[in-house]
């Protein structure tokens, strides 16, 4: 029987601004990627999100991003491998302290936004991120775009690596996500999203925007908790996976 993880980015509120449906979405996912205060989030939000995730029995991961609150961490920043290393270690450490203070254990790390996408195609950046995670705790799982430079870097250094796919994004022929700036980057039709997800998990294939069918490894599925229909979609995707005989759990092997 196939097993797949359902993950969601959360803890993105800060100050007076409230984002997402964190409390509600926790009922449907198996792992949570918590913003660490750079692209979103703040100390109070980090603490509260960790508390909610622990209560729900959801695996907790750090979601480090660029220091770009205005751009929500989605704008490319040209940084050196050393700067990327420091950025990731710092943010992992911040969230890990909150997890430990609440009596929990951190499970994984998933880079955010532009940092994630850049690391998918840039070996030096990917290796610096993987090294940062490994040096902090070699038992942490690295979540990265399926088949990317980031997952390769994680595997090379000896990390448990989860190849991630996206429920609501389209793919390019090289296995990367269609940039949000391009047409048809987001799948708005729920049935199309569900069909894509089931096929990626069951068959290990995805149809790209170029009309070419490519292989893909799906260890974890990213869903988003901030859309108008996020909760209904989260419920639908769980039902679809269960209906296809797929176990939903945050379990990964080397």
Curated annotation (Swiss-Prot):
State its Enzyme Commission number(s).
3.5.2.9
Q: Which CDD domains match?
A: LamB_YcsF_like
Q: Name one Pfam family in it.
A: LamB_YcsF
Q: Which GO terms describe its biological process?
A: carbohydrate metabolic process
Look up the domain of life of the source.
Bacteria
SUPFAM superfamilies, alphabetically? Glycoside hydrolase/deacetylase
Signal sequence residues: none
Q: Which one of the record's GO molecular function terms can you name? A: ATP binding
Q: Which reaction does it catalyse?
A: 5-oxo-L-proline + ATP + 2 H2O = L-glutamate + ADP + phosphate + H(+)
Q: Keywords in UniProt for this one? A: ATP-binding, Hydrolase, Nucleotide-binding
The record ties this protein, via PANTHER family, to: 5-OXOPROLINASE SUBUNIT A, UNCHARACTERIZED PROTEIN YBGL-RELATED
Similarity comment text for this entry: Belongs to the LamB/PxpA family.
**UniProt subunit comment:** Forms a complex composed of PxpA, PxpB and PxpC.
Q: What task does this protein carry out?
A: Catalyzes the cleavage of 5-oxoproline to form L-glutamate coupled to the hydrolysis of ATP to ADP and inorganic phosphate.
Among HAMAP family, the record links this protein to: PxpA (MF_00691)
Question: This chain belongs to which protein, by name?
Answer: 5-oxoprolinase subunit A
Phylogenetic placement of the source organism: Bacteria, Bacillati, Bacillota, Bacilli, Bacillales
């Amino acid at each position: 029987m196939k097993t797949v993880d359902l993950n969601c980015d959360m803890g993105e509120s800060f100050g007076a601004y409230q984002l997402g449906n964190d409390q509600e979405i926790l009922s449907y996912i198996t792992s949570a990627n918590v913003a660490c205060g750079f692209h979103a989030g703040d100390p109070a939000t980090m603490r509260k999100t960790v508390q909610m995730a622990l209560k729900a029995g959801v695996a907790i991961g750090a979601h480090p991003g660029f220091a770009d609150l205005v751009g929500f961490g989605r704008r490319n920043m040209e940084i050196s491998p050393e700067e990327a290393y420091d950025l990731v270690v710092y943010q992992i450490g911040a969230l890990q302290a909150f997890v430990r203070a609440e009596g929990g254990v951190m499970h994984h790390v998933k880079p955010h936004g532009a940092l994630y996408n850049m690391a998918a195609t840039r070996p030096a950046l990917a290796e610096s991120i993987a090294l940062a995670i490994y040096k902090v705790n070699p038992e942490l799982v690295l979540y990265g775009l399926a088949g990317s430079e980031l997952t390769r870097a994680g595997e090379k250094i000896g990390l448990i690596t989860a190849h991630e796919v996206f429920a609501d994004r389209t793919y390019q022929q090289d296995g990367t996500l269609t940039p949000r700036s391009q047409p048809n980057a987001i799948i708005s039709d729920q049935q199309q999203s569900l069909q894509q997800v089931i096929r990626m998990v069951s068959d290990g294939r995805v149809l790209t925007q170029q009309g070419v069918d490519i292989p893909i490894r799906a260890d974890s599925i990213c869903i988003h908790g901030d859309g108008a229909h996020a909760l209904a979609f989260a419920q639908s995707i769980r039902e679809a996976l269960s209906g296809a005989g797929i176990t939903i759990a945050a379990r990964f092997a080397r």
